[in-house]
Structure formats: C-alpha cells, structure tokens
Amino acid sequence: MNFFQYKHNKLYAEDMPVQQLAEQFGTPLYVYSRATLERHWHAFDSAFGNRPHLICFAVKSCSNIGVLNIMAKLGSGFDIVSQGELERVLAAGGDASKVVFSGVAKSREEIMRALEVRIRCFNVESVSELKHINQIAGEMGKIAPISLRVNPDVDAHTHPYISTGLKENKFGVSVNEAREVYKLASTLPNIKITGMDCHIGSQLTELQPFLDATDRLIVLMEQLKEDGITLKHLDLGGGLGVTYTDETPPHPSDYANALLEKLKNYPELEIILEPGRAISANAGILVAKVQYLKSNESRNFAITDTGMNDMIRPALYEAYMNIVEIDRTLEREKAIYDVVGPVCETSDFLGKQRELSIAEGDYIAQCSAGAYGASMSSNYNSRARTAEVLVDGDQSYLIRRRETLQELWALESTI
C-alpha cells in the first residue's frame, strides 16, 4: 500500500495536493511519501520477528540523503556499491557498522575508506578482489570482514538487464568455485569470513527463484562446515518485485516465511536482505506538465517537460509505469496518447498508448517512480536535474533543489 490516493478526484501525496506541490516547486518534480517509505521498510523488518536479521536498504534505488536519513532513523542498514553511496549514507546519519559493500569493481580508495569507517562487511565478487582487500587491510593494520557473493546460476525470470544470478552474468563467484575461494579466504591473514551473499536479479514476482538460490547456498554452507568454516550471516540480496501495473509479487511476510522455513535448521544464522525497489518504487511519483498535444496520421502525442533524462526506465528496460491525471475534476476529452518528453531520442517516452483526459498545461504523474528514477537521472541534452520533495503528512520538504543552468557547466572550462 502507498499513500498516493485520490481525494475528490484530485491526486494527493499523503495529505498534500500534488497540484499544489507542482505549482509551488515547479515541474518536473519527484515527490516521495515518508509514510510509504516507512510502511514498506517495516513490512520487511517485522516479517522476521525475533529471528536475527538486518534490512539493508539498497542505496542505488533512491540515493537522496533525505530518503536515506529516514531509513537511518528506522535503524536500517544499507547496501552500497560505491564510495559515493557510502559517503551519502554517512552524511545522512547512517551507521557504518550496518553497511554492506557490494559491486564488482571496488577501487583501492573505496576499500580503504570502507575499512576506515568500519563497515559491516565487503561482499567480495572475485578472487582478485579478495586478494586486493587482504593486501590493503594488511597495509592499514586492519582485518577486513568479508562475505563472498555467490552466483548460484539461477534464472530469475526478469528483464535480462537486471538478471544478476546466471553464470553468464558478471557478478559474484560461481557456486561451483565458491568452496575453494572460501578455503583461500580462510588462509589470508587480514581477512575475516563473516557470511555468504547472493543476489539473483531485480523485480522478481515469484518466490521460487529465491528458494532455488537458497537451496544451493545451503548445500555450500554444509560443505564449508566440513572445511571448518562457519558463517555468521546469510545475505540473500534484494530483488523482490513491486506492482507497477498488474504484477502480484509476494508480500515480504510470505518471502520471509519461506526463507525461515528453508533456514529453520540454522537458528543462529543472521539473515540479511537488501531491498531497494520494494521499499522506494511506490513511495514516489514523477510529476510533469503537458507542454503540447500533437497528432499525426497514426498517433496522438502528449509532450511533457520530463523525459528519459529524468526517468530512463521505460527507454532502458521497456518498463511499463502507470501515468495518471493529477486533477480528474477537469472536463477533458479522453484520447489515447504516447506520452513523450523533450529529449532528442525516439526512445524518449514515459508510456505509449495511454488513455488520458488531458489538455495543454495540465499536470500528470508517472507512478511507481521512487526507485531508479532520480538516482539514474542525467543531464542529457543539457537539461537540469529535477527537484525532489518529501511529503510528511500535510508538510512538504525540498530535499533536492532544482539544478540551475549555470551548474550544468560549473565543472567545465575552456582553453
């Protein structure tokens, strides 16, 4: 459930009229709901009851420090993939001891900084990385806590660009090689093995791929026991899907119950999850103004002031996201539109063949935009990044101001 609802045919974010936000802050505009973020995080956290667990919000999904601060206040951990994300977490008041560091290309500087602030663990993705971390930790006089990211070769049945658990993907160590890598890790003087990690993909709408991956990890854990290697945690990553249109992904409680049943023989093993989209997607919308309506022999176009520079998911993943009118009290003729943006690319669209009742100057909202929206935005076509607003009840807070045009070239120089 989210807190974007119609009241008297006008769209509200919690107790704030979205039209008022658009008029106050301008468009394009990302709007987030605090109550929705908190509800979704608690859905994961409460699902595990008294079982040792840690919910690590995936920073990549929605990296604004205003959002991260809400997560930190809830006691959330964080899944990061860069030093930039680490610094965001720290700036937002996050606890470094609840940070897990994923990613296939961790640099020397990133590893040093993570060791300096004492993150919870590195999710190691290759033998080379493991040796690199061991060397750097030794130079710093530290012991690096590590979890090996195991690639279980499980088909997540999702878009190929967000499938991460097949043997042809770049992520992690093959499940068939992981035992030997753990043995190697156990011999390195500056490494402490703390757990096992796995992430098979994103926007999964069924439980079976998760359970198949868990089965393979359990087999590996038993093998490690034979080798005298014990684990303190099992990190099953993120990936639980959300409802964009008519998808019916499992509820976090169903997911948790299935995992707890699988892991009932490991009561002391802490479970770590890394949800991102499942927390933030339906906690945000992207508000735009209809600049022009245009028709040709085959199509009607609603041309808006936002596009793939602000929301690239439709272009990159062929993602379907609902588009709705902000004010349904207005008398408008219904028509089928391709909703497009101002960017000079044919792939610049928010949605195709959508029935809308709109006129030029009206506001519309792209739903489920809280994940992989602002965090994947760009300045393509020299367009300034949009503002972001957080709604808390009947109050709104500007958590990112709109970029100025001068800031587009502030880091550049002529010769």
Curated annotation (Swiss-Prot):
GO biological process terms held by the UniProt record: lysine biosynthetic process via diaminopimelate
Positions of pyridoxal 5'-phosphate binding: 239, 274-277, 372
Alphabetized UniProt keyword annotations: Amino-acid biosynthesis, Decarboxylase, Lyase, Lysine biosynthesis, Pyridoxal phosphate
KW Amino-acid biosynthesis (keyword) present: yes
Enzyme active site: 344
Alphabetized InterPro entries for the sequence: Ala_racemase/Decarboxylase_C, DAP_deCOOHase_LysA, De-COase2_C, De-COase2_CS, De-COase2_N, De-COase2_pyr-phos_BS, Orn/DAP/Arg_de-COase, PLP-binding_barrel
The protein's enzyme class: lyase
HAMAP family: LysA (MF_02120)
Assembly and interaction partners: Homodimer.
Function: Specifically catalyzes the decarboxylation of meso-diaminopimelate (meso-DAP) to L-lysine.
Name of the protein in its database record: Diaminopimelate decarboxylase
Lineage, top ranks: Bacteria, Pseudomonadati, Pseudomonadota, Gammaproteobacteria, Pasteurellales
Gene: lysA
